[in-house]
């Protein structure tokens, strides 16, 4: 096989093969077609910039024993403090004017652009692959932002062939020069095999002063040519490439200054002083730095290619012209695939043109896809700390132990702020990704489901694997605990996937759907094979169902509420016997001011907190999980399970109305026991996202009169409707805009998206172009869709980025910058709704 795949995929595909061989209706050729699909998936997704936290960092997917790790860094070495502006990890502190993908598809490649005013650099990185996915090339191209400003672009590449030495020799070694500044390496990986790695200049002017006989200030410190240093760095420390580089160059500077204390060096020799050299006479090792320093007073800039070719490959990339051709083909192919999935017709909005709208959507989707990463390592878990639910104080997780290693293939909310997997976010990411590449969304979903613990059914709310991922997380959030949940959005996404497959085939339980198989001849032009061929999804559902059942049961058990506290109250109200006692829930782990498990951290809850508090959103998410499990059981023909889930779903829906609907407030609310009178059920009503969640998750019956009341709330400009989207909390609420102000007014795309989607479900006429006066729902749908998408576009046009959330006052971007996680759902709104 090409790679050592994870246990998950080995098991899945072996199971599929057994099922096919056992079926009388499927011949060997069909089995071969399944194997071709597997091969296509593994090859097309093997290589990509899967180090989400880096501006550009490569590693292969599901290769963890001996991966080749690669990264790009840069700085202005003409500045004495240039090392402080060395770019490596994506971080808001760098204050780049722009960074991100303009066009990107992990199966194909793309174009990433960096505008770095401090370093006077307009840097473009192209990433392309051979058609079979085995080989790749990275083209690094830079131009000065201001050629009149004296500066350099000192670009630092690093490569590490992890996995140790082979027969006492380095597993990645330089084997020659094809030119004065071109280098060739031979590498070997236990999983990838043998390969060549080349670095070749196309054009550019290395920094030098023609008046000087030499630019060398110490042996090896010469900025007028490519500098190379090889050394041994432990695999677990490779992610510290920036720190190691800064340390080695700083030591070199001190050595130079100590040896020539009285000599005053000209300013244009500073780039040589800031060039890496082998000061300590390291023996060659698995790790390599390559530093190229270009003169940015030359308008034409510079360009060089980094190329990886597997030995024995049939599709090697060997010339500059081939790289150029692959770049052209890749960008054209991605654009064609994008246009096939999304349509941007003229509409009654203020976006200037279809092409501008399309460019915004393509860039936004590209940055969501560009955040996809492969993570491998240990996770910190505290299984000892006990939760005292009566205190409602922040619980310190001080008994963490490393567990693992684990692996996760996932997208991330933000490369600069949150470059790791978030359970709450990922389901929303998949709702967008599946519209472009259904099979890719499935690969991510399957990786997450593999994180379900076999014994307990728990999934951590954040997956933080290894030191590189952990370095970007505040210490107080690094440790996970099995008592804490998060909204189960992954099942929301899986339910949508199954719905798509059912729609495409018709009767999912008929025998005919098994006959629709993968077509190997068209695979390389299709990324929705699983959507069109539900047999694969069914076999996967069979494999994963026991784990999903454990996860479902874990969530219900861990978040169960205390209904007995309400017995006398509800008996007095005459509804105790109608209540379904097993379907009441609250979020475990809330404090006086925050409820992190709910995902809506500071959204106002009952004050003071009480152990008897019941949360309407926790119940609603159980409804979503149950509906998804019912659908899976239907697909698998598990009739008794399906009936049981249908019963639980009905009980959830009834409890939403019986327990959480306030007739006085006309909305869904949390409930608690009145702190001043323990014989009264208190409706804790804070109109906002929690109030509309049963609607957004399609849990209200279609014939319910409550639908119109929820629509009225969403339409009210005095409450949560605005020119920029639905506010997270009503303007009239006492907590609006107060304190941290995270979910107390700011506009979030994920809930807005669910509300728009729910309106399409409850009111099909909202998308129909029919004459006559529009209904309240249609007016809301049309105005919300336009307001939301126009504001996100406007902020992107002005600032260059999507944001985590948006101001309820004037719509400007707030929270994390360059947040193309669930905010990227704007692409669906523009191109699909």
Swiss-Prot record:
SUPFAM superfamilies: Six-hairpin glycosidases. Residues 29-833 are lumenal. The keyword Magnesium does not apply. Pfam families: Glyco_hydro_63 (PF03200), Glyco_hydro_63N (PF16923). It catalyses: N(4)-(alpha-D-Glc-(1->2)-alpha-D-Glc-(1->3)-alpha-D-Glc-(1->3)-alpha-D-Man-(1->2)-alpha-D-Man-(1->2)-alpha-D-Man-(1->3)-[alpha-D-Man-(1->2)-alpha-D-Man-(1->3)-[alpha-D-Man-(1->2)-alpha-D-Man-(1->6)]-alpha-D-Man-(1->6)]-beta-D-Man-(1->4)-beta-D-GlcNAc-(1->4)-beta-D-GlcNAc)-L-asparaginyl-[protein] + H2O = N(4)-(alpha-D-Glc-(1->3)-alpha-D-Glc-(1->3)-alpha-D-Man-(1->2)-alpha-D-Man-(1->2)-alpha-D-Man-(1->3)-[alpha-D-Man-(1->2)-alpha-D-Man-(1->3)-[alpha-D-Man-(1->2)-alpha-D-Man-(1->6)]-alpha-D-Man-(1->6)]-beta-D-Man-(1->4)-beta-D-GlcNAc-(1->4)-beta-D-GlcNAc)-L-asparaginyl-[protein] + beta-D-glucose. Pathway: Glycan metabolism; N-glycan degradation. Residues 1-10 are cytoplasmic. The active site is at 601 (proton donor), 804 (proton acceptor). It is a single-pass type II membrane protein. It comes from the Eukaryota. Glycans are attached at residues 42, 122, 135, 787. It is found in: Endoplasmic reticulum membrane. Its EC number is 3.2.1.106. Substrate binds at residues 42, 122, 143. GO terms for biological process: fungal-type cell wall beta-glucan biosynthetic process; fungal-type cell wall biogenesis; oligosaccharide metabolic process; protein N-linked glycosylation. One of its GO terms (molecular function) is Glc3Man9GlcNAc2 oligosaccharide glucosidase activity. Disruption phenotype: Displays phenotypes characteristic of cell wall defects such as hypersensitivity to calcofluor white and resistance to K1 killer toxin, and results in a 50% reduction of cell wall beta-1,6-glucan level. Abolishes glucosidase I activity. N-glycosylated. GO terms for cellular component: endoplasmic reticulum membrane; fungal-type vacuole. Keywords: Disulfide bond, Endoplasmic reticulum, Glycoprotein, Glycosidase, Hydrolase, Membrane, Signal-anchor, Transmembrane, Transmembrane helix. InterPro entries: 6-hairpin_glycosidase_sf, 6hp_glycosidase-like_sf, Glyco_hydro_63_C, Glyco_hydro_63N, Glyco_hydro_63N_sf, Glycoside_hydrolase_63. Cleaves the distal alpha 1,2-linked glucose residue from the Glc(3)Man(9)GlcNAc(2) oligosaccharide precursor highly specifically. Seems to play a role in beta-1,6-glucan synthesis. This is Mannosyl-oligosaccharide glucosidase.
